[in-house]
Amino acid sequence: MAEGSRGGPTCSGVGGRQDPVSGSGGCNFPEYELPELNTRAFHVGAFGELWRGRLRGAGDLSLREPPASALPGSQAADSDREDAAVARDLDCSLEAAAELRAVCGLDKLKCLEDGEDPEVIPENTDLVTLGVRKRFLEHREETITIDRACRQETFVYEMESHAIGKKPENSADMIEEGELILSVNILYPVIFHKHKEHKPYQTMLVLGSQKLTQLRDSIRCVSDLQIGGEFSNTPDQAPEHISKDLYKSAFFYFEGTFYNDKRYPECRDLSRTIIEWSESHDRGYGKFQTARMEDFTFNDLCIKLGFPYLYCHQGDCEHVIVITDIRLVHHDDCLDRTLYPLLIKKHWLWTRKCFVCKMYTARWVTNNDSFAPEDPCFFCDVCFRMLHYDSEGNKLGEFLAYPYVDPGTFN
């Protein structure tokens, strides 16, 4: 549906709440309420229209690669322009500027000895620090080990650059010129007290024309993979369902409106309890609205950049969501629509190791376990079975065993 033509919550421009009024007033562009914190509420689609209306020049919105200067004499023309700029800045003649370029050019900043690679440590060095560095690099190449800091830097770089400039094989999947891209930070669930307020769990790029359900389906959370039930008597039994299959309800909260996922018959309105609580005893929160998540795109929303919003799923697993940036698509961006929402950052999580071997990631957690030194206690699959069952698979002792899904699963 075209932007601005959809019925439902719209910006009122008052208090940032989406109230059903005609027109969006002065909230079509982000105005900063507090510096470096968040903007005032604005309508995403209207803001995009204003942006596209200003960029009417040839090539302003084009996603084609800029042509390389391949005309004869273009290099000489560039040199002339550089000389003119230097002459203007230094208030000197063109001849003096040309002489400065010839004497102080980059091609003059070379060592006297040719053929030396600055990345290679020479053999006959007398510096102790270079000798230590050389032995360290040789040891790394021999053992093929990479320190943790280097691994994380490589991981972050690959996440950010893996889709840069990627174009679709099918032209129908090409992003349209003038499309909006929003940067969304999904923070840790509130139960992660260490990181819940300041560490983004995931950072994604979403298109303004994408539905809220597409972002909802792309958010990975360990609570969706939990397996219900106690399996001490049947450890080999394969679970029939995970939490994501059983509890499909979820909602986003943006500017006074709860967008509930109602795509499936078993979905419930998780926001109803919050709305009833806010309306009881006149708590002063005003009147909230509800809408169907699958009926709205990001272009239909009123948002504040830098403002904390909410994503709730699995009944009570809550993630703070912050939209940090909004911009037009560029030719260097990933232009394949099918890859969005595009994950560009993901926090590296420590995995919980088995209490026995201290090597493998935990797969089981036990309670009231006479064989364990602590309660609860975590085990990998091998140690769990060796400690709690005999060679024929019979249970030894009394304990309760539950499948454990480690948050580091998404590493």
Curated annotation (Swiss-Prot):
This is snRNA-activating protein complex subunit 3. Belongs to the SNAPC3/SRD2 family. GO terms for molecular function: bent DNA binding; DNA binding; RNA polymerase III general transcription initiation factor activity; RNA polymerase III type 3 promoter sequence-specific DNA binding. PANTHER family: SNRNA-ACTIVATING PROTEIN COMPLEX SUBUNIT 3. Residues 1-22, 63-82 are annotated as: Disordered. InterPro entries: snRNA-activating_su3. The gene is SNAPC3. It is found in: Nucleus. GO terms for cellular component: nuclear body; nucleolus; nucleoplasm; nucleus; snRNA-activating protein complex. Part of the SNAPc complex required for the transcription of both RNA polymerase II and III small-nuclear RNA genes. Binds to the proximal sequence element (PSE), a non-TATA-box basal promoter element common to these 2 types of genes. Recruits TBP and BRF2 to the U6 snRNA TATA box. Part of the SNAPc complex composed of 5 subunits: SNAPC1, SNAPC2, SNAPC3, SNAPC4 and SNAPC5. SNAPC3 interacts with SNAPC1. It comes from Homo sapiens. GO terms for biological process: snRNA transcription; snRNA transcription by RNA polymerase II; snRNA transcription by RNA polymerase III; transcription by RNA polymerase II; transcription by RNA polymerase III.
